[in-house]
Amino acid sequence: MDFTNSSCGGSEHRQIEENKPLLGEMSATGGSKMGAVPCRRSLLHFSGMRYKLLQEGDIQVCAIRHPRTFLSKILTSKFLRRWEPHHLTLADNSLTSATPTGYMENSISYSAIEDVQLLSWENAPKYCLQLTIPGGTVLLQAANSYLRDQWFHSLQWKKKIYKYKKVLSNPNRWEVVLKEIRTLVDMALSSPLQDDSIHQAPLEIISKLLSENINLTTQEHESIIVAIAPLLENNHPPPDLCEFFCKHCRERPRSMVVIEVFTPVVQRILKHNMDFGKCPRLRLFTQEYILALNELNAGMEVVKKFIYSMHGPTANCPHPRVLPNVVAVCLAAIYSCYEEFINSRDNSPSLKEIRNGCQQQCDRKPNIPLRLLHTNPDLVSQEVTSTESRHKSVVVTSNEILVEVERNNTVNQKLKANTGNDSEPNLIDCLLICPACSTISIELSPQADRVLACYVEILKMLSDYDDWRPALAILLQPIPFPKEALAHETFTKELKHVIQRFAEDPRQEVHSCLLSVRAGKDGWFQLYSPGGVACDDDGELFASMVHILMGSCYKTKKFLLSLAENKLGPCMLLALRGNQTMVEILCLMLEYNIIENNDTQLQIISTLESTDVGKRMYEQLCDRQRELKELQRKGGPTRLTLPSKSTDADLARLLSSGSFGNLENLSLAFTNVTSACAEQLIKLPSLKQLNLWSTQFGDAGLRVLSEHLTTLQVLNLCETPVSDAGLLALSSMKSLCNLNMNSTKLSADTYEDLKAKLPNLKEVDVRYTEAW
């Protein structure tokens, strides 16, 4: 029979070209030069018909034995030829049938296939492939030309991958191995097949090769990296290959291969990775790559340019996965700096004491030394020996620390009442260090210091981007750092820049993350407040945080009560130094009757009168109190309706004109009042019914009303812009019996929550809402 090759849809193997070197020669730090860097070839990607890689399929099979006698020629002629239907599977090492009978009783190994061709002789069966095997030929007939070509390319791919697995599993000469790797990469790039395994299979073969041959020279490292670089443009490296890349970053951080080849790989990882938990070595590779950038002469400037390249020149980063991935890398790297300290045998007892709170907070006594290092000479000598042998990254320079809980009578009483023997200690209580005593000093090794400085600096860079700051604040709100880092002065001092950026941001979704995630846990506000473990500036950052929080929606009794219970001393000290925010805080505490103790009230008044700004604001407070007494004096109307189009200023002017102590029903329907009028409404002591129909009264105003008008019985919010954020606050108004939320942004969940928490609620209007 006359069998000839065909072009298979016009696709042919490319010719491999060797072009100019990718990186040229590069001078090493010590003045010596590396060997010539391997060349990078101009690779022409396949541009013809594309096919999906077949793993299995139905096809007709005919086997022909090579004729050796006249009788066998007759028996194998086309007139006696027989076709069998088979469901064939293209396994990793052979071609097998789901029904191993007839021609396919035995599987056909790829190593036994000498050639794969398309049949094109005259009068040949249509859409056939010819597999040349020892002693005969196997014909495969597809249903159409596309399926025939798909089978042809899939069989060729499986056969070649099988061959490369065999060849590269036993390397002898690395010159030959490198040539085979380049050919393998070219084959993958030029293949007309489309499948994830087309690029992943060569990477896994090379990855296995590298994992089994660890004693490679630097030149061989770089040659292999450059050879496989084209495959990494659109694919993540396998885990073993990540280990190889990490090793190269650690050993040759100044290699140009790191910049030329690894940069696009890391950029792709940061843009497309969805979960480092499923591929932790990708995170480790990214971490080592950034550290390699930091080792260059420009250092952090190179890292800064890399972060800028990830963000892009526009105001908003177009890649939503970049920030979470960079933060994940930073958190893991920072934890690694303290990992040996956490796991250290010598330090574990006292750290366990700190973390688990073996002494109850309310029962702790001051000046109880907790030994971190034993002073026994034998133990010290043993420690020195072990240090020299394993290069410890953490040294504790003091022999003892004194842990002291911040004392506040009110807080301690609450802790005694609410905390059981097995409760988790408060983070601040665990880490407060008595300033008068010998403090713990965590000294990291030079390498750990560089790692810490690099990644804290990256967090500072991230906080400088306006579009990244809200997401960064949410990611850092749970304080995802080890307690040992929070006890490290260097770390908290550097991280202060990030917290300062949060405190300066006017957006509520940013500065609200300064507070704790949930009740009973500490947030950045507590850590950087006076008495907190991270406070080193006499409360300047604390004042900034209070200022921004009070300026949004946190001017509430609950927030002021928390400050009065926990931070009254620092507030008074800062007010004494003329801080206007703290002066305002003290005035609000007096105005809202937060402070019940007369002596404390007198002390606050004395503090206010000690500065010009405090004296002025206290006088204004006294004027407001006199006006409030006049307003709340018995008398005046019991019902009042403002004209339509009235504003907040009109309402304030009206309420300042006389006594409204008897006012029970106030209608502001169809006026132009906003949430700002809530400050006037809370001055009405007898108010029972409030109509805000079709006004601009919003969530911020509802929160104020819910704290002060707890006796309100009827509230009409029809056609107001209130949402779940404000409506949830109504759950504290237990006297409400009639509530109109018609045409608001009420959700079904919030409605159910309000019904459960308002026992006196009888009439509710939720028409034209999600809860309707």
UniProtKB/Swiss-Prot annotation:
LRR repeats lie at residues 662-683, 686-706, 711-731, 735-755. GO terms for cellular component: cytosol; nucleoplasm. InterPro entries: CMIP, LRR_dom_sf, PH_CMIP. It comes from the Eukaryota. Its main location: nucleus. Pfam families: PH_21. Residues 52-160 form the PH domain. Keywords: Cytoplasm, Leucine-rich repeat, Nucleus, Repeat. Coiled coil: none annotated. Signal peptide: none annotated. It is found in: Nucleus; Cytoplasm. Plays a role in T-cell signaling pathway. PANTHER family: C-MAF-INDUCING PROTEIN (PTHR25480:SF0), LEUCINE-RICH REPEAT-CONTAINING PROTEIN 73 (PTHR25480). This is C-Maf-inducing protein.
